[in-house]
């Protein structure tokens, strides 16, 4: 078993680690890359939520994606099926893309690059949901709020790029 499978299985084996590892990583990255002062003076698209909404929203999303990974792991703990093996790769890849967004947008101040990352992330999560469906349909369903939020985040990121 390669490193990706080992990481996925060690994280997803228990529902609490599956849920808390993404939350902890997201919290660390979120607190490492705060919006710059000039960000507050930039134009925002309509329906932009207050900054205080992002922390709770992402916490819930990380919990749901983590729980989805646990459900997929439980469906095939030995990772025998292609859906399980490919899903583990996609899950780790989408986490990497997710965790890259804040450094790109806030750290490097590259909103267009962050938008490209968000497009890749959305594609990965959609592919992950499709991959997990035959193995664990409930796991795929737990990704629906995440996909919906990524669509909204794409709107916000694109709006920011167009307005500034």
Swiss-Prot record:
Which subcellular locations apply to this protein? Answer: Mitochondrion membrane
Q: Report what the protein is called.
A: Translocator protein homolog
Q: Its family? A: Belongs to the TspO/BZRP family.
Asked whether the keyword Transit peptide is assigned, the reply is: no
**Which stretches are transmembrane?**
16-34, 52-72, 89-106, 112-132, 141-163
Q: What does this protein do?
A: May play a role in the transport of porphyrins and heme.
Q: Per the record, GO CC terms? A: mitochondrial outer membrane; mitochondrion
Sorted alphabetically, the keyword list is: Membrane, Mitochondrion, Transmembrane, Transmembrane helix
State the annotated membrane topology for this chain.
Multi-pass membrane protein
GO biological process terms held by the UniProt record = tetrapyrrole metabolic process
Look up the domain of life of the source: Eukaryota
User: Do you know which Pfam families this protein is assigned to?
Assistant: TspO_MBR (PF03073)
């Amino acid at each position: 078993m390669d490193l990706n499978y080992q990481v996925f299985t060690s994280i997803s084996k228990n529902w609490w680690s599956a849920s808390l590892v993404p939350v902890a990583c997201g919290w660390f990255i979120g607190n490492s890359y705060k919006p710059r002062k000039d960000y507050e003076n930039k134009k925002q698209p309509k329906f932009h939520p207050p900054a205080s909404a992002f922390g709770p929203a992402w916490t819930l999303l990380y919990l749901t994606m983590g729980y989805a990974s646990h459900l997929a792991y439980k469906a095939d703990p030995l990772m025998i099926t292609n859906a399980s093996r490919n899903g583990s790769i996609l899950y780790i890849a989408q986490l990497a893309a997710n965790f890259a967004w804040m450094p790109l947008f806030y750290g490097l101040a590259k909103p267009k690059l962050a938008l490209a990352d968000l497009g890749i992330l959305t594609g990965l999560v959609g592919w992950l949901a499709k991959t997990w469906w035959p193995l664990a349909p409930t796991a795929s369903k737990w990704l629906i709020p995440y996909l919906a939020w990524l669509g909204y985040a794409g709107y916000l990121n694109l709006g920011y790029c167009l307005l500034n």
